């Protein structure tokens, strides 16, 4: 339950771009304190950008929240957004194919090119995550820009690629999006 509130807090801060958190959130133990620190340095810290985005994205996914407005407000490169949307479209085309609907050759090829298992970013890995999963920092490789996050509950790791553009850290890749196998 505390983690749900923590994720809700991270989401609210991400959406509003605020650096303040309530005293209650700061008092929720080690995980709460980590979130407070992460949120405060989000614009200057590639690890925090990755951490906040993935945890808020997973929270939205679990809650069934339509994340289109939230998604557009996140620190993402245009290339990330394009590939993400292409993966979403490929999934819809694949669902039509599975339903036996007639699909153009162009759509079939598009689906083959951008297809992912189940959903963008997490792919089929989402089935192995717990409903209370929260990602924490595992490592950051400054040379490659890869931040490796690890789910504290299941141990599942997720790579997130960050790049600095005009002094601001942006996400260029995450999981199935722009991260080579």
Spans of model-derived segments:
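Bacterial N-terminal signal peptides
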Residues: 8-15
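C-terminal segment of classical bacterial N-terminal signal peptides
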Residues: 15-22
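Short beta-strand edge/turn micro-motifs at domain boundaries
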Residues: 155-181
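Positively charged n-region of N-terminal signal peptides that target proteins for export
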Residues: 1-4
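Short beta-strand segments that buttress and anchor functional surface loops
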Residues: 145-152
